[in-house]
Amino acid sequence: MLNKDSARVIALKAICLVALEKRSLSESLFPIHGDDLSFAKSLAFGSIRFYHHLNDIITPRIKKPLEKKNLDLHCLLVLGAYQIIYTDISKHAAINETVEVAKIIDKPWATGFINAVLRGIDREQKVIIESKHFSHPSWLIKKIKKDYPEDYENILTENNRKAPLSIRVHPSIDRDEFQKELEELNIH
């Protein structure tokens, strides 16, 4: 059962702060702890990271523009679409839980709308994934395309790739010993 402190509700608030109020994601407060905190941050950071791609998917599926007071529903659709397209969360659970968030934020009238848009995205997921997208603002795509006409697609694609994790070992720690410890923990 979701409540106002659930991971998805917290993630929605963070997404709204960034998308609607132009605040930084690091300014967003995550007032929960443990696994819920990790899940909320994962949803918020992922939704923001792929915001432009998700926005391009959602916008044509909304027949009438949302009123300013209901733009949080657009953010909720971004959150739901992110779960469907970019995570291994069950599609049914992603849609159902996103619809439940609409009730928690006092917009039960929007549940059918949220459900319909997300089910449409789920049905077309294969086409969406196979289509070319860069998840960058259009002004940046134009600039990179102008400056690097031969390589812009590779540049934008690589820029979307998740950065590898690097670990720096303090000089006072034996590097080989530390590497053994990581291997024992099955971290490679």
Where are these regions (language model features)?
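Class I Rossmann-like S-adenosyl-L-methionine
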Residues: 1-188
